[in-house]
Amino acid sequence: MTLTVMPKYDAYKDSGVEWLGEIPVDWNIKPGLVAFSENKRSNKGMKQDVVLSLSYGKIIIKPADKLVGLVPESFETYQIVAPDDIIIRCTDLQNDQTSLRTGLANDHGIITSAYLNLKVKGLYSARYLHYYLHALDTTKVIYRFGSGLRQNLSYLDFKRLPVFDISWETQAAIANFLDTKTAQIDEAIAIKEQQIALLNERKQILIQQAVTQGLDPTVPMKDS
């Protein structure tokens, strides 16, 4: 697999934000309140019954076997999610710095109200903003924010978060580039994982043959 080198701009400038560093010279920064609003749509009355979950940085439909024991009435306390909503797990930043905390919804459904649900506003791309928040998550920048004993995040943190004032077309181009390249990387990872699984299988066969048959597989064996 060959990855195309990411196109670069001709000139950059200091963003004025220490953790952002330099940005393209024609990009500007605005507070997150221009890009995000907080979604608080209650599922009171069971408007939706498809239960979603944030798992490894993706919003997935929760498998039926994971719903065993849950009382349907409890889903009335969940919040409604729509495609392009960005879901954030905001709790316990201090003690958990390994889990992926952001996910982009592709389905209609409901999710626990313990999560923050961000709706993208105006001329902003949900895919681009999710990649942006995902980058802040994986580089641990997101852990600079938050408050309280366990450093929980809130919508206020995202209202203050610096976001880029760039055209929708630029955002879409970046998101499309990342969709393509990350899909290629995921495919390469899957191939490598298959190769590793085959090598591990060969290793186990080799060990089993060596310890039970000796080093010469042509030597006649006798019943143990």
Task: Indicate where each model-derived feature is located.
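Amphipathic alpha-helical segments
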Residues: 24-32, 129, 159-200
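Sequence-specific dsDNA recognition surfaces
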Residues: 15-16, 30-49, 53-86
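Non-catalytic DNA-recognition/assembly elements of restriction-modification systems
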Residues: 11-43, 160, 168, 172, ...
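Short amphipathic coiled-coil heptad-repeat segments
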Residues: 1-23, 183-224
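A short beta-sheet element
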Residues: 79, 83-138, 144, 154
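Positions in alpha-helical segments
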Residues: 15-18, 113-116, 156-160, 183
